[in-house]
Amino acid sequence: MSVAPTKVKFFFGKNCTGESFEYDEGETVRFNYGDEWNDKFMSCIVGASVKCNIWEHNEIDTPTPGKYEQLAQGSTNNDLTSINGLSKFQVIPGDFQWAVDVKIVDNIANTPVGSYEMTLIPFGVPQVVCRDGDDFVQMPIPQLSPADSEIVTQVAVRDTRTGVYVANGSCYFKYDPSTGQVSIRKPVETFPPNMDTVQDDNTSFIFNLNATA
């Protein structure tokens, strides 16, 4: 049994048996309490060119972080019950270590969906781009040394109707290799004053655009 190099295949049964579902590189999937597939995946096959980060919990406000594990490229994982119920996973490129999931929300009145485009550029890493109205976009980060180092990330937002940039600055992301949780630091001196962020789960951040100046 195999899977395409850029995919992960999850199974409802142990030993890669039962109904299965495939997910592509760049996908982050989370199940909430009560969702049909929450805690249901029991085994998986990871493609040769991707890794898969898996979590017991996805809520940032869970009293304890829960279990976290990274599944290696090309691995067959016959029993995932050690995670105590799979609630979230990321399929990331094999040469990266972790990922941040980001989206922009336009809080400016009377603007059509897609009016603002956010570009995030982590130091030394290809940029990711998303527009208001889009779902979360995965931003993979390579192995840092030490592993819990901060990575500075440029933040820029432009008006897609005029091409004018309405926000520009930077922030810092940090990864905890023991829990898989990501945190953000936004220095007053560098973070755009017309924006704020909300952490939506253990790796996901909503960037709110509150004004154009």
Swiss-Prot record:
Keyword Membrane belongs to the record: yes
Keyword terms of this UniProt record: Calcium, Cell adhesion, Cell membrane, Membrane
Listed InterPro entries: Ca_cell_adhesion_N_dom, CAD_C_sf, Dictyostelium_CAD, G_crystallin-like, Membrane-bd
Any Pfam family matching the protein: Membrane_bind
GO CC term, one of those recorded: cell-cell junction
Compartments, record wording: Cell membrane
Coiled coil: none
A GO term, aspect molecular function: calmodulin binding
Single GO biological process annotation from the record: calcium-dependent cell-cell adhesion via plasma membrane cell adhesion molecules
Role of this protein: Mediates calcium-dependent cell-cell adhesion during the early stage of development.
Similarity remark: Belongs to the Dictyostelium CAD family.
Name of the molecule in the record: Putative calcium-dependent cell adhesion molecule 3
Protein's organism: Dictyostelium discoideum
Lineage: Eukaryota, Amoebozoa, Evosea, Eumycetozoa, Dictyostelia
